[in-house]
Amino acid sequence: MVDGSIHVPVQSHEGQHDNSSSLNEEIQTSQDPLGIVESYQESSTSDFDKSHYTHNSSIAAADSEYGSAFIQGQSSNGSEIKSERPSIDKKLDVNIDSHPIEPPPFEHDIGLPASQVPAAEEEVESTPKAKPLYFLLDKRFWIVFFLGQVLSLCITATNTFNGYMSGISNIPAFQTFLVYALLTLVYTPYTVFRMGFKKYFEMIFRHGWKYIIFAFFDVEGNYFVVLAYQYTNMLSASLLDSWATVAVVILSFIFLKVRYHWSQILGVVACIGGLVLLVVSDVISRGDYSAVNPGLGDGYMIIGATCYGVSNTLEEYFASKLPLYVVIGQLSLYGSIISIIQTFIFDRHHLYTLHWTSEMGGYLAGFILVMFLLYSLAPILFRMSSATFYNISLLTSDFWSLVIGIHVFGYHVYWLYPIAFVLIILGLFVYHVFVDATRESIKPWLKKGQGVDGVGTVRRPPSLVSSNDELNKKNDIVVAHHDNEVKERIYDAYLSVKNVFVRKS
């Protein structure tokens, strides 16, 4: 129970009339040690709803942030007993030492379901207003912006390592497996350490199905995108890859009930427009974009981009509710299982005939380390901003690839490239021009008592439970998954799509 909770011993029904005076004394003595209630009792009587006293339950209410609490009861003569501990706004001379403040919660402290939250507090405004260009003075925006470019550089680095390895080997599923395996070795033991074996396996049995779905879309997104480049040309692949951004916007709108400002949609369109200019520049400058089977390759790219969209949306949802080590650990655990199965199905012949060299080992090690960094940092960006901003930030990776290509592969810069890069960067700024940078951090789908306080999150006053209770430390992560909520969101998304295509009779 958080600090400020009030426990009132309740007498049995038979002894209510005989002990009403002792009950009054106990309430006033335990909850009003400074004698404040008497001066406020009469004035506060009309401010509260009248309710009957329940004899078979204790009365408890807490408001840890504002410091107010209320008790209602009924004495033997039918009059109501009311007690109020005044809030900080009363500016009374109260001994603060008698009400110690709990330390801030840590990454593992998870909010309880809304039904278990003891007291209601003021909601955080779900759509903060922002003056035009005010975001330029917001430190949080610049952190999100530069973090997005770091992740974009990670994508560029992985593409570079893939480019080197493509001439030596063709083992995309095995490469992905090694990335998931490293993530599992790092994050899963730490998750077990924080939760304990019993609660960890309880989470696996009760909530593993969610992470299997999450990991499946992530693995298949990686697989189909790599596969698409073997059949279609770079022009089609680059354009269709931007479908991941559109998919995230649609899925966030339907599944997470996110509502976008018109300036955010304009920013997304500007970023995609910049990507189109990049592709056109490639066509003009390099020209030869023959494809083995463009129809099949385009289909693979659409499937892969859609899987990326689903994966990013789910990761933003999970990262807002759970510690990062749980989200990454579960994704990598099930991802490694799925990817090793695909490796034996699709890559086993290549592995048997592969000639390992130190050069290939270096490229593979670089690919794995960069992907490890990408998977570790991406959930932080999901918390601080959104999956949509993450995807439009990655669109600059084509420009960074050109910069590397100039120095490594001897590429020549076409004049449309700088314009395209500026247009993408402009789109990132337009995305936040009329919207507070903290708006997406609030996560409107989080209810009271939900959410996690950790790296990149915005503190939500009613969202956390005390970290001092050892029982909560072990149970919070299991409780915070909210099985029914996920199923309800999936069903609501189904109804939303159905209502679009099916007319009501």
Swiss-Prot record:
Compartment annotation: Golgi apparatus membrane
Record's keyword annotation contains Membrane: yes
Superkingdom in the source lineage: Eukaryota
Membrane topology: Multi-pass membrane protein
Composition-biased stretches (Polar residues): 18-32
Keywords associated with the record: Golgi apparatus, Membrane, Phosphoprotein, Transmembrane, Transmembrane helix, Transport
A Pfam family reported for this protein in Swiss-Prot or TrEMBL: SLC35F
Family label: Belongs to the SLC35F solute transporter family.
Parts of the chain that traverse the membrane: 141-161, 173-193, 208-228, 235-255, 265-285, 290-310, 326-346, 362-382, 389-409, 415-435
Annotated protein name in UniProt: Uncharacterized solute carrier family 35 member C320.08
Species annotation: Schizosaccharomyces pombe (strain 972 / ATCC 24843) (Fission yeast)
Positions where Phosphoserine occurs in the chain: S463, S466, S467
GO cellular component terms listed in the entry, alphabetical order: Golgi apparatus; Golgi membrane
Record's keyword annotation contains Transmembrane: yes
InterPro entries registered for this protein in UniProt: SLC35_F1/F2/F6, SLC35F_Transporter
Residue segments, region Disordered: 1-52
GO MF, one example: transmembrane transporter activity
PANTHER family: DUF914-RELATED, SOLUTE CARRIER FAMILY 35 MEMBER F2
